[in-house]
Amino acid sequence: MTYIVKFRDDALKEWLKLDKSIQQQFAKKLKKCSENPHIPSAKLRGLKDCYKIKLRASGFRLVYQVIDDMLIIAVVAVGKREHSNVYNLASERMR
């Protein structure tokens, strides 16, 4: 089954601020995740059903939540890993 990718409004604003090359890298990885979004090594502790996509070279992270009953990958936050900013943002938005 293929999951549909949807963005939270605030995550979409962050996405649109990204350089096009970063967006393309994330889009490629999101497409791959849409087939199987449950990647054990990418699971985030403390955030229910949340996973990350890493772009190691640029230091960007994308946090998404899997909603299985609706077949949706909801992008929660996009940003730099520095000081765990993107993870803290995702945690706040999941409350």
Write out the residue ranges for each language-model feature:
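Helix-centric, low-specificity signal for extended rod-like, repetitive segments
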Residues: 16, 22, 45-49, 54, ...
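Generic N-terminal leader/processing signal
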Residues: 4, 27, 41, 50-52, ...
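N-terminal first-folded block
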Residues: 7-39
